[in-house]
């Protein structure tokens, strides 16, 4: 997937990089997966009870999640406001307002699912051009791009649902298998594997004492990120911006992309609080191998909100 945006990126907050060194060392102490579906279902039942109970969870038809995120790009960091809108069974929207270092406008990056349709877009200003290349780095057709986005966004959607309410995307027929025991920092953890179509696979770690979900892990290609400076919108015409974008795309297309490296990704779930009878995580920390890539601090959940009729349509 290619994400093109415009924003200024301040120096990285190095404290983001010091999180969870113990976690990474002990994470793989779980034994090889045991095809014990009954044990996996028992762990899942205990966990769903711990975060609110089956009756409360069954009432959830939608969620709106608001907060602030910080994301690292090498030695740079950017951040802003994030709003996630979910309407079950198959509507999903993420809107990231990327703060632009004091400029009058911020770049709004949007990605969404509306049934089987996937889309993304961006708007606004800034002073940095960043493009994230998908595996292979080749230019995809519009049809290929939409299919790739559908797979990526569906997997992301399911990971958010599992992290928050232990419910995968309803249309995703998943299997649960017991994977053993491990440690997440100082907590003993039960571990289950969740797998489904389109190579969806995630490992979920639950506190053995409280049964609260602590961590998700999965594997995927390491993102390839390229950056270039360009004039800010205040000093550039639309033609200047178009030319800068075309030059960056031409340069990336002419390079031979490396074979994508498969790496481990982690989502650490902390700061659980009560919301309308549910116990929900209010901080999600995303790691690529041992490096913290993003922190998402949630300030507000709204259960079963009323959404505008056209919210999930491409805009």
Model-derived segments and their meaning:
Residues 181-315:
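Gly/Pro-enriched, hydrophobic low-complexity segments
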Residues 42-132, 172-180:
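N-terminal mature ectodomain segment of secretory-pathway/periplasmic proteins
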Residues 1-4, 12-19:
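Positively charged n-region of N-terminal signal peptides that target proteins for export
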Residues 117-160:
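Acidic/charged, solvent-exposed loop-and-adjacent secondary-structure segments enriched in E/D, K/R, S/T
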